[in-house]
Amino acid sequence: DCESGPCCDNCKFLKEGTICKMARGDNMHHYCNGKTCDCPRNPYKGEHD
């Protein structure tokens, strides 16, 4: 499925909801979506409160 990236392990996508980047500052955790090998960006804290 994939070759490399933060959401890829042994040529397979990591399952949806796997943290690929820890929260820092005003950013929330970033999670794998189970469909890409890249780590999708998540919104800032408070943006959806």
UniProtKB/Swiss-Prot annotation:
Expressed by the venom gland. Disulfide bonds join 2-11, 7-32, 8-37, 20-39. A motif (Cell attachment site) lies at residues 24-26. InterPro entries: Disintegrin_CS (IPR018358), Disintegrin_dom (IPR001762), Disintegrin_dom_sf (IPR036436). Coiled coil: none annotated. GO terms for molecular function: toxin activity. The keyword Secreted applies. It is found in: Secreted. The disintegrin belongs to the short disintegrin subfamily. Belongs to the venom metalloproteinase (M12B) family. P-II subfamily. P-IIa sub-subfamily. This is Disintegrin ocellatin. It comes from Echis ocellatus (Ocellated saw-scaled viper).
